[in-house]
Regions:
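Solvent-exposed loop and beta-edge segments used for protein-protein assembly and interaction
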Residues: 24-26, 63-65, 127
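N-terminal targeting and processing segments
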Residues: 34-35, 56-59, 91
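Generic recognition of flexible, low-complexity loop/linker segments
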Residues: 18-20, 58-59, 269, 378-380
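Intrinsically disordered, low-complexity segments enriched in small residues
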Residues: 1-45, 118-123
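Short alpha-helical segments and helix-capping/turn motifs at coil-helix boundaries
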Residues: 14-19, 55-57, 63-67
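Extracellular/virion structural assembly segments
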Residues: 38, 46-48, 65, 70-71
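Extended charged/polar low-complexity repeat regions
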Residues: 52, 67-467
Length: 467
């Protein structure tokens, strides 16, 4: 649920769902996108290279506790799994995500991930120290391992593995790989400094420390003949968004392309600017044009109070003492205020139209069970224990029922208010194989062994084949 530009009123969080900075075509391409959330989880992963509050796809981290595994995803959420033995898997029904521990050559034949498991290199499947995550039987796998590093001179070998795992690569259902290269030694030890995508392209990620950014700011001030601004050489080691080592991503270069080896760009594909407190301040595209700018709270590092697309008005935000958004100010459009009560959120726009959200559940399982619209109408929703929609009642009192599969959450049946039903059927890979409407007519789909659609039969009998 989002409101305005945008805010998640259920969490009281300022969010930016996904802004893509790099996306070149090809098999299993490297896509660099940014998501932001002002929400603070109770078990945060360390701050990533885009600064507090921000996440990118590579910011997936698994914490290994005594009896618990905590997967921090790139949306800022923390997913809990029980301890896994080699070859065991855990499944989050609320997020439709599997976590599997390596250590076996094959999964049980009846397992939904059995075929996808075989797409992995044998080395990964047999390693009990690696974990693999996916949100679909179609893949891809996120490979969670550890970064190789150069041991200290006095270190006892072999060194124990760390109590966490980081993203080291992706593997799709065709066995194609994307590799994240972590620095083995030096000031950026353990950080991602390179990526090789499924097309064989290599990207170099240029990182900087807080001290390097401070020195650069001083040199720019000297060359410009201005007074240097207050730019500290170090940052506090902890924020509300997790531990912070102060390392940030400053630019991404394409350094190798097998298709165009002699025609590489002479400038970075994207460049980032930073505040003296290590917060993402600006994004520049490959033409060095600033396309985004961000402003943060003076007291709370990483809490966004304004953002702007170049050439558009600046949108501003205000928060309460609990860190929840209370106002969203848009000088060229609708502004919003948010009032939080127990199990009730009131949203009022600048035209004095009001919506009231009645909620049940907590944190990530909080759902809107009743919505009072600005026109006075009311809609209601029912959810199961893991937050999946079971029924919706419209303003006229008509109820539509939904039947999700117990395991996958995929909708298997929809019953409209007049009692007419549509049924949906899926294969072991969660792909739709047939759908029958209230009129009894059927849509059918067929796939090859790799899960690619090869034939579709329309309800009128027309057949379309794909090659």
């Amino acid at each position: 649920v989002t409101s305005g530009h945008p805010v998640n009123p259920l969490l009281g969080a300022k969010v930016l769902p996904g802004e893509t900075d790099i996306a070149l075509p090809g098999p299993l391409p490297f896509i660099l996108s940014r998501t932001y959330s002002s929400y603070r989880t109770k078990t945060p992963a360390p701050v990533g290279s885009l600064g507090p509050g921000w996440k990118m796809p590579a910011d997936i981290r698994l914490q290994l506790r005594d009896n618990t595994l905590i997967l921090s995803d790139n949306g800022g959420r923390s997913l809990y799994f029980e301890h896994l033995f080699p070859g065991e898997d855990g499944y989050s029904r609320s997020e439709s995500l599997w976590l599997v521990r390596g250590g076996v050559a094959k999964l049980d034949e009846g397992h939904r991930l059995a075929a996808l498991w075989q797409a992995l290199p044998e080395e990964l499947r047999l390693s009990p120290h690696r974990y693999l995550a996916t949100n679909s039987p179609q893949g891809p796998w996120w490979v969670l391992g550890w970064c190789e590093r150069v041991p200290e001179a006095d270190e006892v070998l072999p060194a124990p593995l760390p109590p966490y795992r980081v993203l080291t690569g992706l593997v799709d259902r065709f066995g194609r790989t994307q590799t994240f290269h972590h620095e083995a030694a030096g000031e950026f030890s353990g950080e991602i400094t390179g990526v090789t995508d499924g097309a064989g392209r290599h990207f170099r990620l240029v990182l900087t420390t807080q001290a390097q950014r401070a020195e650069e700011a001083r040199q720019q001030a000297i060359s410009g003949g201005t007074e240097p601004s207050a730019f500290p050489d170090t940052l506090p080691g902890y924020t509300e968004y997790g531990r912070d080592n102060g390392i940030r991503l400053s630019a991404v270069w394409l350094t190798h392309d097998p298709e165009y080896p002699e025609n590489l760009p002479a400038a970075p594909l994207v460049r980032y600017g930073w505040t003296p407190r290590g917060e993402l301040a600006a994004v520049y595209d490959r033409s060095n044009t600033q396309v985004r700018s961000f402003t943060y709270d003076d007291k709370y590092r990483g809490r966004m109070v304004a953002h702007r697309h170049t050439g558009r008005p600046e949108i501003r935000y205000r928060y309460d003492s609990d860190g929840r958004v209370t106002e969203q100010l848009n000088p060229a459009g609708l502004s919003y205020t948010y009032q939080y009560e127990k199990d009730r959120i009131t949203i009022t726009d600048s035209l004095d139209r009001r919506e009231v959200l009645h909620t049940q559940g907590e944190a990530g399982l909080k759902r809107v069970v009743k919505k009072e619209h600005a026109d006075g109408s009311v809609t209601q929703s029912q959810f199961d224990a893991v937050g999946r929609l079971r029924a919706q009642t419209d303003a006229a009192g008509r109820t539509t029922e939904y039947s999700p599969d117990v395991v996958t959450g995929l909708i298997t049946r929809i019953t409209t208010p007049d009692g007419r039903a549509s049924a949906f059927y899926y294969n072991h890979h969660n792909q739709l194989t047939s759908a029958t409407g209230p009129d009894g007519l059927e849509l059918r789909r067929e796939y090859d062994e790799s899960g690619r659609l090869i034939q579709e039969t329309a309800p009128d009998g027309d057949i379309t084949r794909y090659r």
